Amino acid sequence: MNLSEKSVILLRSFFYLVGLYLLYGFLFTALHNLLPNLDTSSYEQRFIMEMLTENPLRALIMIVIVAPVIEEMMFRSLLKPSHIELVLFVVIWPVFFLLRFVPLDVHWVLKLTFTGVFLFTAVYIGQQLIPRERTLTVRNWLSRYEFLIWIITSLVFGFVHITNYVDHFTINLALFLLILPRILAGFMIGWVKINNKNLPWAMALHAMNNGMAFFFIYLSL
């Protein structure tokens, strides 16, 4: 499959995703009319909204560039993975949790630079410590069960975004409805990864999706 064909899959998937969002919006409105006591307005993405208001440039970089790269390493790297993608998966989760110990008052540019250098170093070390032949069995197993992995990673991807709305993980109908678009996005991004067989394509669709969301949210401020 050449670059042009992969680009068509990317663009087609983006428009399919937009269509799914429109269908979701219609059903969401209908459900609200059927269940007037269903309260979703009490849940807000406070951190994201504050970042958009106080520092739009930071929000743009974090939402459209950083989040797609990091999150695709965490989730879609398990779909038909290459050796380097499996190394990325092994490395990114420990790095992600270690970064939570970085003080909150560290300037975001410095934190982002540190994250990039730290991640690059960790991936390099991971490649040296994990030979290609050692990952072959795992890669073959993951490829064999790609449909199951696709479902699981899409669902987990959606559910981890619950913490956008609440400090601690909890679930109810209102929160499920709020994260449902992330689950839909997870499936479509995974579809692109499976078909284009390369993680950057998944990152690209994720960035396009987040860019669209950023645009509409910023206009609404």
Regions found by a protein language model. Give the residues of each.
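Short acidic/polar alpha-helix capping motifs at helix-coil junctions
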Residues: 12-14, 41, 151-157
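Transmembrane helix-loop-helix hairpins at the membrane interface
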Residues: 62-221
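Membrane-helix interface motif
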Residues: 26-39, 85, 218-220
